[in-house]
UniProtKB/Swiss-Prot annotation:
Residues 1444-1459 have a biased composition (Basic and acidic residues). It comes from the Eukaryota. Its main location: cytoplasm. ATP binds at residues 1070-1077. It is found in: Cytoplasm, Cytosol; Peroxisome membrane. Residues 1-13, 327-348, 1391-1401 have a biased composition (Low complexity). This is Peroxisomal ATPase PEX6. Its EC number is 3.6.4.-. One of its GO terms (biological process) is protein import into peroxisome matrix. Keywords: ATP-binding, Cytoplasm, Hydrolase, Membrane, Nucleotide-binding, Peroxisome, Peroxisome biogenesis. Interacts with PEX1; forming the PEX1-PEX6 AAA ATPase complex, which is composed of a heterohexamer formed by a trimer of PEX1-PEX6 dimers. It comes from Penicillium chrysogenum (Penicillium notatum). GO terms for cellular component: cytosol; peroxisomal membrane. It is a peripheral membrane protein.
């Protein structure tokens, strides 16, 4: 390195790296400095001036650097922007620097300067950031400095970096070196390597060994390139140390750093992982080589379309056939006509720019004029333009603009589309720069290219007035004769100062070339393009002119005393420069009555803010204007809660004013900011001589308020609405809300932020807004329409009822006066009961109506607690004076009937759906100004937050922001441990990256998990158990059936959207311990469903009606938590057969009836019926009410039995021992071979648990023996494990002997006889069709056919009937019964009552011992386990689940009589 010019010798000992301790300051603000390039410097380290070093680093740190090895410090620089607010808003670049040597420096550096070598490539990220801030400054030149902001920084160590290189880079490089290494020779021919045929020499093929060697060389080259970098930045282009082209000397394609973790820039360590990615080159210039390193900082971004190769250089007329049309960007005569300027306007000459004279269309012969097109000439505006009627084009057929109609000195102006500003534009970017005390609310901003079309200069006074939307149709505004006279000035205009800014987005026409050469048949087929430029207006000014969509801007003209105007641009410049609005002698202000401005506690803060507002700037106001004052409500209530006097009161006012004025900064979202509104009543100007002489007001009634001379009077209050937030961003302008920003947002050179965030508006909010707009409209008030009383009800708290109502009022500018019924009840109950409660309620309502009954909505929260009889009368009186009353409740049943009768509209707010949850999350993120990284998908987060309401979703967002802060702090602590220097969170933010700047997906996942864990009990959010298919051993056929039943409605909901029924009820039955509950949990986990587990006793309640209400609440919670699984364990205790219980009140029967009613709606095709799956588990399905088993309820019955093979038992053992440390000699197959086939899943679980317990006991015994055998005597077990225990003493391994020993002690939970009983129950409920029926011998399918068969003595079951569990459905093979009619005698059947019945004489008479038979559904009772010849089944099911066999066993023979 050559530092001799600045006094640093090459023999000077290198200084070691700085070790910063606690002396670093965490809250240091950036310092303004200048960055310059020096061609005489070498290396990649810059030089820092001495004054900057003293300002950035502490003295002790500088002393440590002087004795270090290399003396390298690290700073972060960013382009200077006037809109700086925080470190996160800038794109910082970390660079290595050294301090300027002072001993032998012949040339002194400039003050606050950073010098960098011209050949340094570490400035690439800074150049990119500089190009985004100012597109004209995307490169640096030597000895020309740029303004920057600089901070000291401690670099973060990188964990992983991804380096992208071109695919087959070394292979192509070797081929080039082989072909051109010796240059062009005669032996190769005159065409080089290409002969006369034009074919190149074939490249040699690479073997696998050559490819491996090439990969090693490439890895070494990348490592060498990275080793030369002190700081690695994402996006850096690294030149690879490979030979250049032998002939062109072009360097090989470089490597690019595509991604870094955990931050976007930092230090390389020995532990940093380097991931090499080989990608194909993209784009037209993908094969272009990297420019030389010396010219890297001088390059300018080139357009890819500017390629002048032979293949692409052709004119528009020579376009190749078959290609798509090329769009060209030209300026046409239509843009000239849009200026609407007259012949006397001095801005016409500026429109004749060179752009309008260039045409890129192919030369063609002119078409003969005919039809409509014959009327269009060169003077007619282009069709599709903004003003295409030709009125202002002299010579056109539609123009009446002639020399006789021209008015000198007055131009037509130009129409602009209005864009509202969200924050103030700094004065530093304006030219000419306005004074600091000028009113920023009277500034408008346009693109600098449109100033000439208006006819003014930047900083001039212009007049603005509302205009209509320009018509796209050229004949839309066509009029004839005298009807086309231009209207006179309406007088509703106001003067503003206009400033031109560069870099604003401008719309220009783009026309496609007509390649076909055919003539367009009509003008209407031309695509309409809107070319209206934009004007950026402050939101308060926009609200004072009634929020127009378009504005007409024209230059100000000043009349002389004799009434004639003075044309001429020079005179216009003199008048504009000399004229200013008149000063106001006296201004009257009216306080707009709002709940905030009427609060007595906030009055001192309100007037202190008003004083600060008018003293800080010379405000320009007009009679009727609205003025907004920001007030910090929290600080105002805290500071002015008591009475202050003297100096302390003035200090409190200063605190309130300054914090209120700073509300539009980044901390606006952390404080509650309110706005108080004042209306300008009367403005009296100081001088009226000019107005008397000219007879007109040349300034539109505006005047300047000078705080030194103007007398201000606050006279009374005004009742009116405030500006609505729809289409107006005054909340961001006044600091009520924070402007949302993304991770990759970069500051703009003009500082304009005009894109309002798109908030998601729920349909209920729109409905309430429409109702309030209609109720408060002047027409409704004039006609005396009844007021609107809206009730918002929900079953859960914090669902957002009051928030929706408040936002609906804010949308249309209506005041919201909240009243908490609990406060009313508390104050009234403490002072006299219902009478006082009524008086407090009326007093609060009367206070709200002071703000205007026609523009105030009364919001009563928790109205269900106002149950007194006197409240009904009070509410009726309140409604007589109000226009809008909104009440919220979570228990609508407790609201008195008198109040319910007054309600006109009632809306229910349920738990938000997935799309609604996504909208709530989006609004919460936007309002808090939280940056989201690219990997965050709010839709997936909404999917994981089922059953959470609006309050919980907002808490999730806040928890995610807190998780980001904790993550950054932990990253700083980890970097501190690695480097040994002090690292702050600010250093992580300076390093940048998505993870540092924004909230990541991992932060949201942690927030969702924490929210579910902390709020599950309070809000009833169901928990998803962590059980998967791997935890369920065996049951493969059951898993397949579940996937078919549940997965199809979840993945293809559109199939069921139009009424198609789906099977959402599943019943698991079988012996106890076979995994029914475990399988239900696995369903919820595998399909990402929420999980409810309902036990029978939870539904019972001693009060009448409450048990059924509990059933309704369970299913309502399940619908709110969709997609959800409701699991009824031991269903036979919840829904037994009706009529068999002995309870006097019939509670169980009512529970069953309510359960049946709820299950009917679960599988419907309605909009809100899907997404809930009901699963029941029982050991005794024969005890269930038969109505539960019909299709549409529990229509899918799955039997879960014991394993019938040892291989299935081994599969279950493998699932149970997944987390066990098994001995290598253990074979689970051998263990399973020794087990009986009567073991259930629970028995196998007990076997594994006992085996593990025996292994632990054996290990504990061995440790005790080892302790007792110690030479120095026994020690405590804890001391042994802390000091003497080895790895073998801690690890517990289960051996095969442990399993065998556990098996010897294990008693099966289900005996073989009980398993036979469950198998018979299974045969009762299941039937398998093993053979297809012959259509000719099919069983009777109608009731009439069955009755005829029975009456004729025939068989209702054919010979080739389907088999039931192996038994043929023949008189000799089935022991069944047909309810009330038994065809085969001698088969005892036990009835529901437990009595045995027999058939007599083969005629189907069913005789009971009690003299009565049980028929109908009750005859499907439980079967006796002791009867060997029991009836097997009453229901038959084919192999195809969709083919149903008609059951006729419930029919009776009408010819028989029951005895």
């Amino acid at each position: 390195m050559d530092f001799e010019q600045y006094g640093q010798s090459s023999q000077q000992p290198r200084q070691r790296r700085r070790r910063a301790g606690k002396r670093r300051l965490n809250n240091k603000t950036p310092i303004a400095a200048r960055l310059a390039l020096d061609p005489q410097l070498r290396g990649k380290v810059g030089i820092l001036s001495e004054d900057l070093a003293n300002d950035l680093f502490q003295q002790q740190a500088l002393q440590d650097v002087t004795t270090s090895d290399d003396g390298v410090l690290y700073v972060a620089i960013a382009p200077h922007t006037p809109t700086y607010t925080s470190v996160e808003d800038q794109a910082w670049t970390i660079l290595p620097v050294r301090i300027q040597p002072t001993e032998r420096s012949p040339v002194a550096m400039s003050h606050s300067t950073v010098l960098f070598p011209e050949s340094a490539d570490s400035l690439q990220p800074f150049l990119q950031a500089l190009g985004k801030v100012d597109s004209s400054r995307n490169s640096l030149q030597a000895h020309r400095s740029v303004e920057i902001r600089i901070l000291d920084v401690a670099p973060i160590h990188l964990d992983t970096i991804f380096v992208t290189v071109e695919r087959h880079l070394l292979r192509n490089h070797d081929d080039v070196q082989t072909k051109f290494g010796g240059g062009f020779t005669n032996a190769q021919g005159p065409n080089g390597l290409w002969g006369k045929t034009g074919k190149s020499v074939e490249a040699k093929k690479y073997s696998k060994r050559a490819a491996a060697d090439a990969e090693q060389r490439l890895t070494a080259a990348v490592r060498e390139a990275l080793g030369a970098q002190r700081i690695v930045h994402t996006g850096d282009v690294l030149p690879l140390p490979l030979p250049s082209h032998p002939i062109t000397y072009a360097p090989p394609p470089p490597a690019r750093i595509s991604f870094c973790e955990p931050v976007s820039q930092g230090l390389l360590m020995s532990t940093t992982k380097i991931v090499l990615v080989q990608a194909r080159p993209q784009g037209i210039r993908a094969q272009q080589t990297m420019p030389s390193r010396s010219a890297l900082l001088k390059q300018v971004a080139e357009d890819e379309a500017d390629d002048t190769s032979n293949e692409q250089f052709y004119s528009a007329a020579e376009d190749k056939p078959g290609e798509s049309g090329t769009e060209m960007e030209v300026t046409s005569a239509a843009e000239e006509s849009e200026t609407e300027g007259s012949a006397g306007s001095m801005s016409d000459s500026s429109d004749d720019s060179l752009e309008d004279m260039i045409s890129l269309s192919a030369p063609e012969l002119p078409q003969p004029p005919s039809g409509v097109m014959s009327s269009l000439t060169s003077a007619t505006p282009r069709a599709g333009g903004r003003r295409s009627d030709g009125i202002h084009t002299p010579g056109s057929v539609a123009s009446n603009f002639t020399s006789a109609t021209m008015r000198p000195g007055r131009g037509g102006g130009k129409t602009f589309k209005v864009e509202g500003l969200l924050q103030q534009v700094p004065n530093e970017v304006l030219h000419p720069r306005p004074r600091d005390d000028e009113d920023v609310d009277s500034f408008v901003f346009v693109d600098i290219s449109t100033l000439a079309k208006i006819g003014c200069f930047s900083g001039d006074w212009v007049r603005i007035e509302a205009a209509e939307e320009p018509q796209l149709n050229m004949f839309a505004s066509l009029k004839f004769g005298s009807f086309n006279d231009s209207p006179e000035d309406s007088g509703d205009w106001r003067p503003v100062k206009i400033f031109g800014l560069s870099g604003l987005p401008s719309s220009k026409p783009r026309y496609a070339i007509n390649h076909s050469g055919e003539r367009r048949p009509s003008i209407s087929q031309r695509p309409p393009t809107r070319l209206t430029p934009s004007v950026f207006v402050p939101p308060l000014l926009l609200g004072n002119i009634e929020n127009p969509k378009y504005l007409r801007i024209s230059p100000m003209t000043f009349a002389t005393p004799n009434g004639s105007s003075k044309p001429g641009i020079l005179q216009h410049m003199k008048n504009t420069a000399a004229k200013n609005p008149p000063l106001a002698k006296e201004v009257t202000l009216l306080k707009v009555s709002t709940p905030l401005s009427m609060d007595r506690v906030l009055q001192p803060a309100l007037f202190a803010g008003l004083k600060q507002y008018f003293e800080s700037r010379r405000r320009i106001l007009k009679s009727g204007d609205l003025v907004g004052i920001s007030v910090d409500e929290g600080l105002g209530r805290a500071v002015f809660s008591g009475t202050g006097s003297g100096d302390s009161a003035s200090q409190e006012e200063d605190i309130t004013i300054r914090l209120g004025q700073g509300a539009n900064a980044t901390n606006a979202g952390t404080r509650k900011i309110g706005v108080a509104w004042f209306r300008v009543g009367q403005v009296a100007p100081t001088t009226v001589e000019e107005l008397e002489e000219t007879g007109e007001d040349q300034w539109g009634g505006v005047a300047v308020l000078d705080p030194a001379t103007t007398r201000m009077v606050q006279a009374g209050s005004d009742v009116s609405r405030v500006p609505g937030v729809l289409g107006n961003g005054w909340e961001y302008w006044l600091g009520v809300k924070t402007i949302p920003k993304t991770v990759h947002d970069a500051p703009t050179p003009h500082g304009i932020v005009a894109d309002p965030p798109q908030s998601v508006i729920p349909p209920l909010q729109q409905r309430i807004r429409d109702l309030m707009s209609a109720a408060t409209s002047p027409r409704a008030i004039q006609l005396g329409m009844k007021p609107v009383f809206i009730l918002l009800r929900s079953q859960q708290r914090h669902i957002g009822k009051a928030t929706v109502a408040t936002r609906a009022c804010s949308d249309i500018g209506i005041h919201t006066f909240p009243i908490d019924a609990y406060d009313i009840l508390t104050e009234g109950g403490a002072n006299g009961g219902d009478v006082k409660t009524e008086a407090y309620l009326k007093a609060r309502a009367e206070r709200a109506f002071h703000c205007g009954a026609n523009c105030t909505a009364l919001l009563i929260r928790h109205i269900e607690v106002l149950t007194a009889d006197r409240i009904v009368t009070a509410m009726s009186d309140i409604l007589n004076d109000a226009r809008v009353v909104i009440a919220t409740t979570t228990d609508v049943e407790t609201i008195p009937e008198g109040i319910r009768s007054l309600i006109t509209h009632e809306f229910e707010m349920g738990a938000p759906e997935e799309k609604e949850r996504e909208g709530i999350l989006q609004n919460a993120v936007t309002e808090r100004g939280i940056r989201l990284s690219a990997d965050v998908d709010l839709g997936s987060i909404a999917l994981k937050t089922a059953a959470l309401v609006a309050g919980d979703l907002v808490d999730v967002v806040e928890r995610a922001a807190g998780a980001r802060t904790a993550r950054l702090e932990s990253l700083a602590e980890a970097s501190k441990k690695i480097s040994g220097s002090e690292v702050f969170v600010r250093d992580v933010l300076l390093a940048g990256g998505d993870g540092a700047r924004g909230v990541t997906k991992a932060d949201f996942d942690a927030a969702v998990e924490a929210a579910r864990k902390n709020f599950a009990d309070s809000i009833g959010a169901p928990k998803i158990p962590n059980v998967g298919w791997d935890d369920v051993g065996g049951l493969t056929n059951v898993k397949d059936a579940l996937v078919e039943t549940i997965q199809l409605p979840l993945e293809r909901p559109e199939l069921f959207a139009k009424g198609m029924k789906k099977r959402s009820g599943i019943l698991f039955y079988g012996p106890p311990g076979t995994g029914k509950t475990l399988l239900a949990k696995a369903i919820a986990t595998e399909f990402s469903l929420n999980f409810f587990s309902v036990k029978g006793p939870e539904l019972l309640n001693m009060y009448i009606g409450e048990s059924e209400a509990n059933v309704r609440r369970v299913f309502q919670r399940a619908r709110d938590a969709r997609p959800c699984v409701v699991f009824f364990d031991e269903l036979d205790s919840v829904a037994p057969k009706r009529g068999n219980q002995g309870d006097s009140g019939g509670v169980m029967d009512r529970i069953v009836s309510q359960l049946l009613a709820e299950l009917d709606g679960m599988n419907g095709g309605e909009e809100n019926s899907g997404g809930v799956f009901v699963i029941g588990a029982t050991n005794r399905p024969d005890l269930l009410d038969t109505a539960l088993l019909r299709p549409g309820r529990f229509d899918k019955m799955l039997y879960l039995g014991v394993s019938d093979t040892h291989r299935k038992q081994a599969t279950i053992l493998e699932a149970l021992t997944r987390k066990f440390a098994l001995h290598p000699d253990v074979s689970l197959d051998r263990v399973a071979e020794q087990l009986p086939l009567t073991y259930t899943g629970a028995d196998l679980y007990a076997l594994c648990s006992d085996a593990m317990l025996k292994a632990i006991t054996r290990k504990a015994t061995a440790v005790d023996e080892k302790i007792n055998a110690l030479p120095n005597g026994p020690v405590s077990t804890a001391w042994f494990f802390d000091h003497l225990a080895t790895k073998e003493d801690v690890n517990v391994m289960v051996t095969e002997e442990d399993f065998l020993s556990a098996q010897g002690e294990l008693v099966p939970s289900v005996s073989a006889k009980e398993l036979e009983h469950f198998e018979r129950i299974r045969q009762t409920f299941e039937a398998v069709d093993k053979s297809k029926q012959d259509p000719a011998a099919a069983a009777p399918q109608t009731i009439a056919e069955a009755m005829e068969a029975f009456s004729l003595g025939g068989s209702a079951i054919p010979e080739e009937a389907p088999t039931i569990n192996g038994d043929s459905l023949t008189p000799g093979g089935i022991h069944g019964r047909i309810k009330g009619l038994n065809r085969w005698p001698g088969n005892p059947v036990r009835s529901t009552s437990g009595q045995s019945t027999t058939s007599s004489k083969g005629k189907g008479k069913s005789v009971s011992k009690k003299g009565k038979s049980r028929t109908g559904a009750e005859s499907d009772g439980s079967v006796d386990g002791d009867d060997e010849d029991m009836a097997d089944a009453n229901s038959k099911e084919d192999e195809d689940e969709d083919d149903y066999v008609v059951r006729t066993d419930h029919l009776r023979n009408p010819m028989e009589e029951v005895e």
